[in-house]
């Protein structure tokens, strides 16, 4: 079993519980170079809001820093950005789906920034 399969297996119980709650889901994906955050509808069929380190606005803010987006500073910017977009779309309450990643480092930085910017989870 490789790392990706193990991570996806760890994500299953969390996603099952979130689907029972019937609330919007803040799902993240972390690669070596970038971090992505999506808010998915309670039905699970549509992405309502998204933010990542690939967006021009985020990249412009990261231009003076080292790295392209694979660090906690970039994750903090993405967390703030996704929270701002969610509030503009009328979403305040979400369930945090860490996608099997440990709640540490970039994942924690993104979650903390989203909470500070006004998302509740």
UniProtKB/Swiss-Prot annotation:
GO biological process, one term: translation
GO cellular component, one term: cytosolic large ribosomal subunit
A Pfam family: Ribosomal_L18p
Keywords tagged on the record: Ribonucleoprotein, Ribosomal protein, RNA-binding, rRNA-binding
Any one Gene Ontology molecular-function term assigned to this protein's record: 5S rRNA binding
Function description: This is one of the proteins that bind and probably mediate the attachment of the 5S RNA into the large ribosomal subunit, where it forms part of the central protuberance.
Database matches in PANTHER family: 39S RIBOSOMAL PROTEIN L18, MITOCHONDRIAL, LARGE RIBOSOMAL SUBUNIT PROTEIN UL18M
Protein name, as recorded: Large ribosomal subunit protein uL18
Gene: rplR
């Amino acid at each position: 079993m490789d790392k990706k399969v193990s991570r996806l297996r760890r994500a299953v119980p969390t996603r099952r519980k979130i689907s029972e709650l019937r609330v919007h889901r803040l799902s993240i994906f972390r690669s070596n170079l970038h971090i992505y955050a999506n808010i998915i509808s309670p039905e699970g069929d549509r992405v309502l809001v998204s933010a990542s380190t690939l967006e021009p606005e985020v990249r412009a803010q990261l231009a003076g820093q080292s790295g392209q987006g694979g660090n906690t500073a970039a994750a903090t910017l993405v967390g703030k950005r996704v929270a701002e977009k969610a509030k503009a779309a009328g979403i305040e309450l979400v369930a945090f789906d860490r996608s099997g990643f440990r709640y540490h480092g970039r994942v924690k930085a993104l979650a903390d920034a989203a909470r500070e910017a006004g998302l509740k989870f």
